[in-house]
Amino acid sequence: MTTVHPGTGAPADAAAPQVLGPAPVPGRLARGIRTPDGERFLADLAGTRVRQNGCAAAAYAALYANVDVITAYPIRPYTAIMMNLAQFIADGLLDAEYIHADGEHSQFSAAFGAGSCGARAFTGSSGVGVTYGYEMYSIISGARIPIQMSIADRTLDPPGDFGSEHTDALCTRDMGWLLGWAATPQEVFDKSLIAYAIGEDPRVLLPQMVVQDGYFVSHIAGEVDMPSAEQVDAYLPPYQLPFPLDPRHPVSHGPQIHPEQGPPLQLERARAMEDAIPIIREKTDEFAEQFGRRYPHFVEEYMLDDAEMAIVISGGHAVTCRAAVRRLREQGIKIGMARLLWIRPFPTEDLQRALRGVKVAGVVETNLGLGGASYGGILSLDVTTALYQASGERPLVTSFMAGLGGETVPVSEFEWMAAKLGQALERGSVEKATHWVGFE
């Protein structure tokens, strides 16, 4: 038996590992082959614009990606993603194994096993489901198995209010997964394809979390442009894992090792996350060339050219933030918005460039980081670290706890944040590290 280090492939003197072709289930198609009904369905969709919510957009992206294995366990608000995929399989539109697990730990374990065999695997969850399967995150990324997980954010218990909050996904931020938020159903669809293309690239080989705000994005319909299957296949070819579990070419995954063998593997995983940065740029540009929709690589810069103040945000509340920025600009207030599209890898240099010239920045925290340095949220810890490393003048930074428990963040609250930033600009210092919006 040959032991293969994740990411290195088989030894040079060994026969080239082969990706398994037809799945060992009678009647299954070969990997990468669409069903006849699926081909006709996607042909009819090509070039159309449909109204669908974020859950449907994630499911359609998995259909276009022609995933091989889906592992599911229901928990709202992400459940509709798996309901749609189950219907696709029942209607003969998708040839995939659908595994209904007994809980999220088993669900993610099954996706890991499928991905280890060379299958394009898809899974997902929300809220406490994300945390229930926590053990598997480091295992999957450490084995360099690029499965995809679609998360519809939900508040952790307590208080059990089931609203949208980013804490669930951010709890996993240091486990070696690519992690990014989508702000609209169109972006959910597009980012799901982009994330697969990045994670499956042999220069990266990392799992991905594509996150959307529960209910605000997952359940509110928006317009989504549907491509042709040929476009998607050209951008995202059939997945080929360099080191699949294959009885014809045995390898070992996850063997026990000596302590001194551990640090090199951890270093390799850290470097893989750094190495993903140029690949994210590359795959985002390739997507624009193939589909005609261009996204910022890491940071959306909105009205920041001459801004003295900036709101730093991620997720769906950025849509409302843009409206607030436009209204404030009409009043002569020089404010802009920096939206983070990826949290891991964190876009340190891109954020530094986006906020150059800005004198004070406020980070919107739709999450809870109890006892942290700012005694508020999680995101500001990365933002302040990134800005502290910048050369020259750095903006003052404060944070705003808003949207917790799934509350809306209306334009009026963004205007309140802008007023606080304006006061800090006049004083030359921030009043406090964290403001709780609606409680002051």
Question: Where are each of the predicted segments found?
Answer:
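Thiamine diphosphate
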Residues: 2-171, 176-177, 193, 213
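Conformationally flexible catalytic loops at phosphate/diphosphate-handling active centers
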Residues: 20-28, 207-300
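Peripheral docking tails and interdomain loops at the edges
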Residues: 27-32, 365-440
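Glycine-/acidic-rich phosphate or pyrophosphate-binding loops and their flanking alpha/beta elements
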Residues: 53-58, 286-309, 322
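Short acidic, glycine/serine/threonine-rich loops at helix termini
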Residues: 81-84, 110-113, 133-137, 158-164, ...
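Short helix-loop-beta junction
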Residues: 86-91, 286, 323-337, 389
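Conserved thiamine diphosphate
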Residues: 163-214, 392-407
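Redox- and metal-dependent alpha/beta enzyme cores, enriched for Fe-S-associated oxidoreductases
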Residues: 298-333, 346-353
